[in-house]
Amino acid sequence: MTTIISEAPVCVELTNKSLISDQVWERLVSYIAKEKDMERPIAERIMDQTLGFLKLIALSPSRTFCPSKMVDIGWHAFLMHTREYFEFCERVNGQYIHHDPTEVLVVVARTGGVTETVRAMKANSITVDEMLWTALGDCDGDGDGSCDASSACGGEGEGC
Protein backbone atom coordinates (compact mmCIF):
# COMPACT_ATOMS: atom_id res chain seq x y z
CA MET A 1 0.00 0.00 0.00
CA THR A 2 1.31 3.43 -0.91
CA THR A 3 1.06 6.24 1.60
CA ILE A 4 0.25 9.67 0.24
CA ILE A 5 1.08 12.89 2.05
CA SER A 6 -2.06 14.64 3.18
CA GLU A 7 -1.90 18.35 2.40
CA ALA A 8 -4.05 21.22 1.35
CA PRO A 9 -5.39 20.70 -2.18
CA VAL A 10 -2.97 21.63 -4.93
CA CYS A 11 -4.25 23.19 -8.13
CA VAL A 12 -2.38 21.51 -10.97
CA GLU A 13 -3.30 21.82 -14.61
CA LEU A 14 -3.80 18.38 -16.15
CA THR A 15 -2.12 19.08 -19.48
CA ASN A 16 -1.58 15.49 -20.63
CA LYS A 17 -5.11 14.23 -20.04
CA SER A 18 -6.00 14.89 -23.68
CA LEU A 19 -3.67 12.09 -24.80
CA ILE A 20 -6.39 9.55 -23.97
CA SER A 21 -10.17 9.49 -24.23
CA ASP A 22 -12.32 10.67 -21.33
CA GLN A 23 -13.57 7.10 -20.90
CA VAL A 24 -10.05 5.66 -20.58
CA TRP A 25 -9.03 8.55 -18.31
CA GLU A 26 -11.95 7.81 -15.99
CA ARG A 27 -11.18 4.10 -15.91
CA LEU A 28 -7.49 4.61 -15.10
CA VAL A 29 -7.98 7.34 -12.50
CA SER A 30 -10.69 5.30 -10.75
CA TYR A 31 -8.45 2.23 -10.80
CA ILE A 32 -5.52 4.10 -9.22
CA ALA A 33 -7.72 5.73 -6.56
CA LYS A 34 -9.28 2.40 -5.61
CA GLU A 35 -6.19 0.17 -5.80
CA LYS A 36 -3.90 2.60 -3.98
CA ASP A 37 -6.57 3.92 -1.60
CA MET A 38 -5.95 7.54 -2.49
CA GLU A 39 -8.05 10.59 -3.18
CA ARG A 40 -9.15 11.16 -6.76
CA PRO A 41 -7.29 14.48 -7.27
CA ILE A 42 -3.98 12.77 -6.49
CA ALA A 43 -4.85 9.84 -8.76
CA GLU A 44 -5.60 12.35 -11.54
CA ARG A 45 -2.25 14.05 -11.06
CA ILE A 46 -0.47 10.70 -11.12
CA MET A 47 -2.18 9.66 -14.34
CA ASP A 48 -1.52 13.02 -15.96
CA GLN A 49 2.20 12.82 -15.16
CA THR A 50 2.32 9.21 -16.34
CA LEU A 51 0.94 10.29 -19.72
CA GLY A 52 3.51 13.10 -19.88
CA PHE A 53 6.28 10.64 -19.05
CA LEU A 54 5.14 8.23 -21.77
CA LYS A 55 4.90 11.12 -24.23
CA LEU A 56 8.52 12.00 -23.39
CA ILE A 57 9.59 8.45 -24.20
CA ALA A 58 7.83 8.72 -27.57
CA LEU A 59 9.49 12.08 -28.30
CA SER A 60 12.98 10.78 -27.42
CA PRO A 61 13.15 7.19 -28.72
CA SER A 62 16.92 6.91 -28.45
CA ARG A 63 16.92 7.74 -24.73
CA THR A 64 15.78 5.88 -21.64
CA PHE A 65 14.05 7.65 -18.76
CA CYS A 66 13.25 6.85 -15.14
CA PRO A 67 9.77 7.39 -13.65
CA SER A 68 9.30 8.59 -10.09
CA LYS A 69 7.61 6.23 -7.61
CA MET A 70 4.33 8.06 -8.03
CA VAL A 71 4.47 8.11 -11.83
CA ASP A 72 5.31 4.42 -11.83
CA ILE A 73 2.01 3.79 -10.02
CA GLY A 74 0.23 5.31 -13.01
CA TRP A 75 2.34 3.35 -15.48
CA HIS A 76 1.53 0.08 -13.71
CA ALA A 77 -2.17 0.98 -13.74
CA PHE A 78 -2.04 1.71 -17.47
CA LEU A 79 -0.22 -1.58 -18.12
CA MET A 80 -3.03 -3.43 -16.34
CA HIS A 81 -5.44 -2.08 -18.97
CA THR A 82 -3.69 -3.84 -21.83
CA ARG A 83 -5.95 -2.92 -24.75
CA GLU A 84 -5.98 0.75 -23.87
CA TYR A 85 -2.23 0.80 -23.19
CA PHE A 86 -1.41 -0.95 -26.46
CA GLU A 87 -3.63 1.44 -28.44
CA PHE A 88 -2.05 4.45 -26.72
CA CYS A 89 1.48 3.22 -27.44
CA GLU A 90 0.70 2.56 -31.10
CA ARG A 91 -0.92 5.97 -31.54
CA VAL A 92 1.63 8.06 -29.61
CA ASN A 93 4.82 6.09 -30.15
CA GLY A 94 4.20 3.90 -33.20
CA GLN A 95 5.09 0.85 -31.14
CA TYR A 96 4.72 -0.65 -27.67
CA ILE A 97 6.51 1.15 -24.82
CA HIS A 98 8.04 -1.53 -22.63
CA HIS A 99 8.40 -1.24 -18.86
CA ASP A 100 11.77 -2.65 -17.83
CA PRO A 101 12.70 -2.01 -14.18
CA THR A 102 16.16 -3.50 -14.77
CA GLU A 103 16.83 -0.96 -17.51
CA VAL A 104 15.69 1.83 -15.20
CA LEU A 105 18.44 0.92 -12.72
CA VAL A 106 21.04 1.31 -15.47
CA VAL A 107 19.57 4.69 -16.41
CA VAL A 108 19.68 5.86 -12.80
CA ALA A 109 23.35 4.95 -12.53
CA ARG A 110 24.21 6.52 -15.89
CA THR A 111 22.13 9.71 -16.06
CA GLY A 112 20.79 10.75 -12.69
CA GLY A 113 17.43 9.07 -13.24
CA VAL A 114 14.41 11.09 -12.19
CA THR A 115 16.30 14.39 -12.19
CA GLU A 116 17.27 13.89 -15.83
CA THR A 117 13.73 12.81 -16.71
CA VAL A 118 12.29 16.01 -15.22
CA ARG A 119 14.85 18.11 -17.13
CA ALA A 120 13.94 16.34 -20.37
CA MET A 121 10.21 16.80 -19.75
CA LYS A 122 10.69 20.53 -19.23
CA ALA A 123 12.94 20.77 -22.31
CA ASN A 124 10.13 19.16 -24.33
CA SER A 125 7.50 21.55 -22.90
CA ILE A 126 5.79 18.79 -20.91
CA THR A 127 4.28 20.18 -17.72
CA VAL A 128 5.93 18.76 -14.58
CA ASP A 129 3.99 18.35 -11.33
CA GLU A 130 7.05 18.84 -9.12
CA MET A 131 5.50 17.25 -6.05
CA LEU A 132 5.09 13.93 -7.84
CA TRP A 133 8.68 13.97 -9.05
CA THR A 134 10.59 15.44 -6.11
CA ALA A 135 8.83 16.01 -2.79
CA LEU A 136 7.59 12.45 -2.52
CA GLY A 137 11.01 11.27 -3.51
CA ASP A 138 12.52 8.47 -5.42
CA CYS A 139 15.33 7.71 -3.07
CA ASP A 140 16.03 4.77 -0.86
CA GLY A 141 15.92 6.90 2.27
CA ASP A 142 19.61 6.96 3.09
CA GLY A 143 19.95 10.57 2.01
CA ASP A 144 22.39 10.02 -0.84
CA GLY A 145 19.80 10.50 -3.58
CA SER A 146 20.27 7.09 -5.15
CA CYS A 147 17.37 4.97 -6.27
CA ASP A 148 17.11 1.30 -5.42
CA ALA A 149 15.37 -1.59 -7.16
CA SER A 150 12.09 -1.20 -5.33
CA SER A 151 11.83 2.54 -5.92
CA ALA A 152 12.59 2.13 -9.61
CA CYS A 153 9.60 -0.15 -9.86
CA GLY A 154 7.08 1.77 -7.83
CA GLY A 155 7.94 0.61 -4.34
CA GLU A 156 7.44 -2.56 -2.35
CA GLY A 157 8.51 -4.68 -5.32
CA GLU A 158 4.93 -4.91 -6.58
CA GLY A 159 4.40 -5.91 -10.18
CA CYS A 160 8.04 -6.37 -11.11
Per-range role (PLM):
Residues 2-160:
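Acidic, Ser/Thr/Pro-rich intrinsically disordered cytosolic tails and loops
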